[in-house]
From Swiss-Prot:
Belongs to the elongation factor P family. This is Elongation factor P-like protein. The lineage of its organism: Bacteria, Pseudomonadati, Pseudomonadota, Gammaproteobacteria, Alteromonadales. It comes from Psychromonas ingrahamii (strain DSM 17664 / CCUG 51855 / 37). It comes from the Bacteria. GO terms for cellular component: cytoplasm. GO terms for biological process: peptide biosynthetic process. NCBIfam families: PRK00529.1, PRK04542.1, yeiP. Pfam families: EFP, EFP_N, Elong-fact-P_C. One of its GO terms (molecular function) is translation elongation factor activity.
Length: 190
């Protein structure tokens, strides 16, 4: 059983006899009192979809729920549902657009390393690899000699996400984006 300080985003825990998926974690260190950090977690009930915010002490033990991760590929959009296909047995998994709103801006048909998180056989979350490769569809023209300085410019990617890129990067380039911070990491390997 891990401590609250060891819990990561998209972890499933059992709390008050329900299974919740952790969508967001904020760490705070209270001033003027002894003790450790506090972790405020935004959790969604995997059955009803209801949201709760709960605060835990850093050393509080949280029981993990039984979950399974399956490697998948993004397949298609069906209304408000995003459909992912299991890489091994081709089982389709539907995830609601709202439940994966943060991840949508980082996936396309070519994204590799996606995993669907299943609790009791039902898909509840999508886990991204640490980085994804996306194409720049719009940015200001590249500046000759721009690699000599550390200045950046905004670039709109094929998924609609906007990231800051170095001035020498141009429209049409494929870049690596850090999925946790939504930041430019470098040019993608050709």
């Amino acid at each position: 059983m891990p401590k609250a300080s060891d819990i990561k985003k998209n972890t499933a825990i059992e709390y008050n006899n329900n299974v919740y998926i952790i969508r967001d974690i904020e760490r705070s260190v209270p001033q003027g009192r002894a003790g450790g950090s506090l972790y405020r977690m935004r959790m969604y009930d995997v059955v009803s979809g209801s949201k709760i915010d709960q605060t835990f002490k850093d050393n509080e033990m949280l029981p993990l729920a039984d979950l399974v991760r399956r490697n998948v590929m993004f397949s298609y959009i069906d209304g408000e549902q995003y459909v992912f296909m299991d890489n091994e047995d081709y089982t389709p998994y539907n995830l609601d657009k709202d439940s994966i709103a943060d991840e949508i801006l980082l996936i396309n048909e070519d994204t590799q390393g996606l995993q669907v998180v299943l609790v009791d056989g039902a898909p509840v979350a999508l886990e991204l690899p640490s980085s994804v490769e996306l194409e720049i569809v719009e940015t200001s023209p590249s500046i000759k000699g721009g690699s000599a300085t550390a200045r950046t410019k905004p670039a709109i990617l094929s998924t609609g996400l906007t990231v800051q890129v170095p001035e020498h990067i141009s429209t049409g380039d494929k870049i690596k984006v850090n999925t946790a911070e939504h930041k430019f990491m470098g040019r993608a390997d050709k």
